[in-house]
Amino acid sequence: MEKVTNSDLKSSVDGGVVDVYGEDSATIEHNITPWSLSVSSGYSLLRDPRYNKGLAFTEKERDTHYLRGLLPPVVLDQKLQEKRLLNNIRQYQFPLQKYMALTELQERNERLFYKLLIDNVEELLPIVYTPTVGEACQKFGSIFRRPQGLFISLKDKGKILDVLKNWPERNIQVIVVTDGERILGLGDLGCQGMGIPVGKLALYSALGGVRPSACLPVTIDVGTNNEKLLNDEFYIGLRQKRATGQEYSELLNEFMSAVKQNYGEKVLIQFEDFANHNAFELLAKYSDTHLVFNDDIQGTASVVLAGLVSAQKLTNSPLAEHTFLFLGAGEAGTGIAELIALYMSKQMNASVEESRKKIWLVDSKGLIVNSRKDSLQDFKKPWAHEHEPVKDLLGAIKAIKPTVLIGSSGVGRSFTKEVIEAMSSINERPLIMALSNPTTQSECTAEEAYTWSKGRAIFASGSPFDPVEYEGKVFVSTQANNAYIFPGFGLGLVISGAIRVHDDMLLAAAEALAGQVSKENYEKGMIYPSFSSIRKISAQIAANVATKAYELGLAGRLPRPKDIVKCAESSMYSPTYRLYR
């Protein structure tokens, strides 16, 4: 695969004339008719975010579609509109204000929203998604304006198929669904977790090029155990404690069956921010019957593995020679560990069980060891190794002597000065990944990692941090952001018509991402490529994933494209305005 080495490139994969959805790929070469239930015109056209262009409507379009007098006389092109909006957004003092401004734009002018996001992805990504989306979910009831997805609740049991049919789009390719029980590191936010599927799917379109009309955000509302929300007069969800057990399982099963019945075999269902006990169970239950993906387990694992594979060039040692210690043994931690073990098993030509022996996990009760096995949850048991009990992280570091420290605990500042110094005393180049988000939950900051390691740490985080200067050298830490992986991963599934997700596809995605890191990136201390080239990166990931789907016999779109990278690029949604007949 060809590397993307120019970190200053705009994310400008424009899409081709005909995309994978079998229609015009939003290019300006073809005039189109703004169909709704009827041809939109006049005031209704200005109110339709799919077709509204604001002041960019041409003189001819204003006459043809009865817009004369409904707009000021000036005609502004999309580039100038984008410049004006970016200036306006930069005037806001607080990230949540910027988030609300972007949401309002998305609801008013869809193409301008995506054009702005694609062209300014590094600046706006922390606003559209983590960390700002966490605050937006906490205050979702207060800032709610209009629905952007489907809300399915216990009240809809027995009629979920009818609810799905209420959604106006029929050709759905990607669904992101949450039950709101574990939103980022913020806990149970109930129905207000809808901000997560909406934000994730905005990135599927902006970064991965999946058409917005093919994306469906869904919240499954089974109640909330958050007393603050239950007592909030502006809370928008069911005011009851969470349903569990059979009642919960039956609702989810009805949803999964209805999705398959309504949208077919090839629709991707991404589980998002489910609590650990449900996340693993749902993935295991439906992975053989549906095209399912859990970003918290599989997406996080793939992006972290990519960083570790990339870092091999800085540590000068293969992954199989490393020893890993995790703080956090939930869905993220165990998912990452499992994918690392799979990768090492292929690298060493050994069994996954043998590879697991190089990976240790610490949970709230200390190091996971064999003597604790009877009391462990099932998903933790494969990581229980023979060792005497160790109560805390620092003790585990001294006992295990890891070369890689990975945090997925959700406990802010748990990588203390003593922890970083201990890692630095063991390793010349300690590899430290503080993955928890939002920023307040990060195990340490970039400044702490570089300062306490005396500039020797190789560092990546789950939340964004500013560059750090230490003893005259500037270190640019990179964010191990799932947004590197899931948009391109999803696009790869779409263009191949995949019917199932296989672990080898996750490895393929990780290898594709690692292959995009340039020499210039490494010199700055980065183990991930610049986000400014994310669309080109996503195309490479999509091509790798699609190729693997064809190799595994899981691709349903035949014949196989001759040039899969070109196919991925030409399938991408373009937000450039179209001319109307």
UniProtKB/Swiss-Prot annotation:
NADP(+) binds at residues 182, 296, 325-341, 437. Keywords: Cytoplasm, Metal-binding, NADP, Oxidoreductase. The keyword Cytoplasm applies. The record marks D296 as: Important for activity. Divalent metal cations. Prefers magnesium or manganese. It comes from the Eukaryota. Gene3D superfamilies: Malic enzyme, N-terminal domain, NAD(P)-binding Rossmann-like Domain. Specifically expressed in roots (only in steles of secondary roots). Its EC number is 1.1.1.40. GO terms for cellular component: cytosol; mitochondrion. Pfam families: malic, Malic_M. The active site is at Y129 (proton donor), K200 (proton acceptor). A divalent metal cation binds at E272, D273, D296. Its cofactor is Mg(2+); Mn(2+). Its main location: cytoplasm. It is found in: Cytoplasm. Belongs to the malic enzymes family. Homohexamers and homooctamers. This is NADP-dependent malic enzyme 1. It comes from Arabidopsis thaliana (Mouse-ear cress).
